[in-house]
């Protein structure tokens, strides 16, 4: 799980793709010969085609909100500090908790991100893009990405994390792609932490039970989840309901932590109950 990755370390490690070095190069683990760029490109394309041939869509997790090492990043080497948000005291903004935040509101950074996403859609035929900490990217950039990709690929989907993270913006009046700004990015979905925490328990207390493990939760809050979270989602399709993802424990492991005395058969039923909730919600 990426939450176990210390992204402030300066030594290479397996990082689940959350330590970006070059946004337009496939990761070497997907290639039989990672030391040859042409092999990386060809074999990732072959992999995506094979998945498509078997009826599977491919959604790419993209991490444009930060880079591995802002000082060493290629664009910051060419134009120092341009790609990253830097505070008035000269320090890199760190809303991502990864050491730096991307200054997507700057025109050429925005163009780079738009061109990069279009490249993956055009060349690799990705069916969707899941944005890590989308809330550090401004709404104008998100809208330009979707508009550019949809010109050629109208069915590509877009969604991401809309958590409200604090960052040092480089311009006044910039609006970020947080949950509560969903009306500014129509067609972009946001993960709903509300239904996640109601079903499995709060993320910040690993043994706190959720509804499926017997905790008493707000009936009104559950109803709001079923109705697509109208408090922040402008449209139901902007609310991505879920109970488990790549972060933290799996749902079944979380149930084991919050209902340790329950037999396995009961834990399976709790797991199925959670699935029924998010699958039947708007």
Segments predicted by a language model, with ranges:
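Feature marks short, surface-exposed loop/turn motifs that line or immediately flank catalytic pockets
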Residues: 66, 137, 166
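Conserved alpha/beta catalytic core and glycan-binding cleft of carbohydrate-active enzymes
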Residues: 146-282
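Substrate-binding/active-site clefts of carbohydrate-active enzymes
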Residues: 2-124, 134, 142-153, 157
